[in-house]
Regions:
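Hydrophobic alpha-helical and helix-loop surface patches within well-folded domains
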Residues: 71, 104-257
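Acidic/His-enriched low-complexity segments
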Residues: 1-139
Length: 257
């Protein structure tokens, strides 16, 4: 995706069937079970930043106004979860003391957003602590988000987050997406669905994690209100679309709802 001075990939497409899009930018066996580690070499102008999955291990000065960043993902991950973003980003950094180690927190934001990052991501450490307590140590290298113009996507170490969510306030809407994408680190990224027909499990677990976290912090009334909305939607709409399916091999056009 190109947008002004920014270029990035998104690992899934809502309207693509199947949804996984590793094959759109590198040769691969683009299924959910053929996992691999990655080395990425990104050559960019000196005044730009790259953000990819894994860790930035080295930057080479090419002597011609460009540099090459070397990113390494040591964990084996599915093809749709590897990613890159390049642009006129400003990097905001923090750390979170996890169960086993200190984990970097990175946010790659546009220059006009950087002053809004800290307030927007106020609860990020609380999300990480909650999920680690419930599901075990954070399984990847860093907690990292990059501002993009199109949607949200749980790439390993490089979550695409809609720039419209970086508002300078910690609110329910931004917290929902920040925590939702983080929870995929355990459900979707570490443990991945076996095929496209079961991709709804990735989203189902992440939706559960949202409700689990918010119920813990806002109480049972929040949970019952949210579940009530979902039940109302089912009662009001599913009969019109015959919207019922067995809980496996779901049609791909309803993976995301």
């Amino acid at each position: 995706h190109w947008s002004d001075d920014y270029v990035y990939n998104l690992g899934v497409g809502f309207d693509s069937q199947p949804h996984n899009l590793g094959k759109t930018w590198f040769p691969c066996v683009d299924n959910f079970t053929d996992k691999a580690s990655y080395d990425l070499y990104i050559t960019i102008p000196n005044d730009m930043l790259s953000s990819c999955g894994g860790l930035l291990t080295e930057t080479y000065n090419n002597g011609n106004g460009t540099k090459t960043d070397h990113w390494v993902v040591n964990q084996e991950i599915s093809t749709y979860l590897i990613s890159f973003a390049i642009g006129n980003f400003v990097l905001w950094e923090d750390t979170y003391q996890g169960l086993e180690r200190e984990i970097p927190i990175n946010v790659y934001a546009k220059p006009n957003q950087i002053d809004k990052v800290e307030a927007t991501f106020t609860n990020t450490k609380a999300f990480a602590a909650f999920f680690e307590d419930k599901f075990g140590p954070y399984p990847f290298n860093r907690i990292s988000y990059v501002s993009t113009n199109l949607g949200c996507m749980e790439h390993v170490d490089n979550v695409a987050l809609s720039s419209s969510l970086i508002t300078g306030t910690s609110n329910m809407n931004s917290d929902f997406f920040i925590s939702h994408e983080m929870s995929h680190s355990w459900f979707g990224n570490k443990v991945t669905c076996a095929n496209a027909g079961e991709m709804w499990l990735n989203e189902g677990f992440a939706t559960f994690c949202n409700n689990y976290y918010f119920t813990e912090f806002y109480g049972d009334d929040f949970y019952f209100e949210e579940m009530g909305k979902r039940i109302d939607d089912i009662i009001m709409s599913c009969h019109a679309t015959e919207g019922w399916h067995p809980l496996n091999a779901l049609p791909l056009d309803i993976t995301y709802g």
